[in-house]
Structure formats: C-alpha cells, structure tokens
Regions:
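Second-shell residues forming the walls of enzyme active-site clefts
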Residues: 1-101, 107, 111
C-alpha cells in the first residue's frame, strides 16, 4: 500500500470508486477511506493531497470538488487547469490551510533546505 511508508511526508488520493468500501464517494471524497483506512488503520500522518479537482472523473464544480475533498480529510487540494478566474474563485470560497497542514508543510520546507 502506498501510504504505509511512514517516511513519506505527502501522499495523494485518487478519484477511484472503491465500491466495497464506500459505494457513493470516490476516495478523494470518502471520509471512510481517508479517516478510517488511510489515517487510522494504515497510520499515515503526513499531508494528504487530492488528485486534480478539475479532472472529468469528478462530477461537481471546482469549488464543490475542493470542499468535498477537504471535508473528507484531504489537507491540500490540487488544481492543475490553471484558469485564473477559477483559481481566484477557489481562493475566495475554499477555507484556508489548517494548522496541521501549515505545520507539516513548514517541516517539509525545512527538510528541503
């Protein structure tokens, strides 16, 4: 399993539906997958990044995709399309980085220096 390496500081979810675990939500939107499996059972303590929220595998608008990812337990949201108007809207409507994510990214930055 990709999350088992405790030395990994970052990991990424996928927009895959694991029907035996969560019939309604892709992994990126699934609290059950993120909280119960990745965080608790596997014990991943790093920053969890969503896959690109502009991918066609997701059926909602960008803001909804971002919020659903964060509410499920992702710490950061990946948006790769680079559309300025959409990026501005995301910045205005999606919550700021939480303390856990700020601390972990700061630790990672120090590690890179």
């Amino acid at each position: 399993l990709p999350f088992k390496s405790n030395s990994s500081r970052f990991a990424m979810t996928a927009h895959i539906l694991y029907e035996k675990i969560d019939k309604k939500n892709v992994a990126t939107f699934s609290k059950k997958i993120i909280s119960e499996i990745i965080r608790k059972r596997i014990g991943f303590k790093g920053i969890l990044i969503s896959d690109d929220i502009s991918m066609k595998a997701l059926k909602y608008d960008l803001v909804t995709n971002a919020k659903k990812s964060l509410l499920a337990g992702c710490n950061l949201v990946l948006y790769c399309a680079g559309n300025y108007k959409d990026t501005s809207k995301l910045i205005k409507e999606v919550p700021f980085i939480d303390k856990f994510t700020a601390k972990k990214t700061s630790e990672f930055y120090k590690f890179l220096r």
